[in-house]
C-alpha cells in the first residue's frame, strides 16, 4: 500500500477558507509562486515557513514546523 502524504499547507488554507492569493499576500509572493510552492514544485523558504506557521498557529495552536513541512 502506498503512503499518501497530506499537504497540510493546502489543507489548512482550505480549512480556513483562504484563497491562494490571500496566502500569497501574507507571504509577499506572487500567486503563481505560491501555487508552485503549495504543489511542492518549489520549496518554501525558511522565512516563508515561519510566516505560515505563525499564521496557522492562531487557529491550530499545537502545530509545529516539522509536522507542517516535513
Feature roles, as predicted:
Residues 8, 36-37, 49:
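A general lysine-centric signal
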Residues 13, 24, 53:
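The alpha-helix within a helix-turn-helix
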Residues 64-70:
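Short amphipathic recognition helices of helix-turn-helix/homeodomain-type DNA-binding modules
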Residues 11-14, 28, 39-41:
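Residue-level detection of the helix-turn-helix DNA-binding "recognition helix"
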Residues 1-15:
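A short, Lys/Arg-rich alpha-helix, primarily the initiator
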Residues 17-36:
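Short alpha-helical DNA-recognition segment
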Residues 47-63:
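DNA major-groove recognition helix of helix-turn-helix/homeodomain DNA-binding modules
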Amino acid at each position: 500500500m502506498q503512503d499518501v502524504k497530506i499537504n497540510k499547507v493546502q489543507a489548512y488554507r482550505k480549512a480556513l477558507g483562504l484563497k491562494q492569493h490571500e496566502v500569497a499576500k501574507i507571504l509577499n509572493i506572487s500567486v503563481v509562486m505560491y501555487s508552485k510552492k503549495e504543489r511542492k514544485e518549489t520549496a518554501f523558504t525558511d522565512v516563508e515557513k515561519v510566516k505560515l506557521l505563525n499564521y496557522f498557529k492562531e487557529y491550530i495552536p499545537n502545530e509545529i514546523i516539522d509536522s507542517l513541512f516535513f
